[in-house]
Amino acid sequence: MAKHILAPTKIESVGNKPKEILEFFADKKNWVKVPSECGYKEIVTIKPFGEIIAKFDTGNSGMSVIHADKMQVKDKKVTWSLLGKTITSDIIRKEEISVGGLRNYDEDRYDIKLNVEFLSGMYETEFTLDDREDRTPILFDREFMSRVNVMVSPDRKYVVTTKYSLD
C-alpha cells in the first residue's frame, strides 16, 4: 500500500498573507486619496461670519491668516471683528512674524483657532490675526491644503464653490 504525501495547497503556502493584505487596506492611514482640484480662490464658511472668500496660497510657508479689525487683547483673549461681527477668541500664542515681499517688516501677531467648513468637512484651523483690509480676508497655508486634500489650480477661481457676489 502506497503512502500519499499531502503537498501544501496554495492557500497554505502563502500563510497569513491574505489576512495581512486585508488588514493593511482596512487601515485608513494606508489609503492614498486623490486630491480634489480647487481654485486659488474659493468660498469657505466660518461661524459666526458665514461665507468668506479664501485664497489658497501654495507659496505661503507660515500659517493661515485671517483679517481682523479692531483687535483688543485682554489677558489670554483677543476680541476682534470681521465683516461687521465681533468675537472673542482664546489666544494660542503670540508670535513675532517676519513679513517679507513688498511689506518687509517684523510684527507681533496673535494665533487663534477657528472651525472652517470646506468640501463637506469641518476643520479646526489655527490662524494668525492680521490686517488684510485690501486683500483676500483669508489666506490658507500648505498645511491646511494638505489636511483638506486639495491640489490648487493657480489659474482658476471657484472650482469647487460658487462665487455668488462675494468677490
PLM feature segments, named:
Residues 2-167:
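Pepsin/retropepsin-fold aspartyl endopeptidases
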